[in-house]
Amino acid sequence: MKKDLHPDYHVINVVMTNGTTFQTKSTWGKEGDTINLDIDPTSHPAWTGGNQHLLDRGGRVSRFKDKFKGFA
């Protein structure tokens, strides 16, 4: 196997939307970093059967709606 070809594979902490925390191995971040999920199996409509909702991160959805509001 070639040296320095593959990314570092290490343990990170994952925090789900309900506060549950678990550890998994990933190439994301550094050893011991924490990732907070916006959507996970406990809150995603595909798994919960609820209505779909949009997360407006950075106003992207609002800008899209404003741009195409008269188009239908």
From Swiss-Prot:
GO terms for molecular function: rRNA binding; structural constituent of ribosome. InterPro entries: Ribosomal_bL28/bL31-like_sf, Ribosomal_bL31, Ribosomal_bL31_A, Ribosomal_bL31_sf. GO terms for biological process: translation. Keywords: Ribonucleoprotein, Ribosomal protein, RNA-binding, rRNA-binding. GO terms for cellular component: ribonucleoprotein complex; ribosome. PROSITE patterns: RIBOSOMAL_L31. Part of the 50S ribosomal subunit. Binds the 23S rRNA. Belongs to the bacterial ribosomal protein bL31 family. Type A subfamily. HAMAP family: Ribosomal_bL31_1. This is Large ribosomal subunit protein bL31. It comes from Maricaulis maris (strain MCS10).
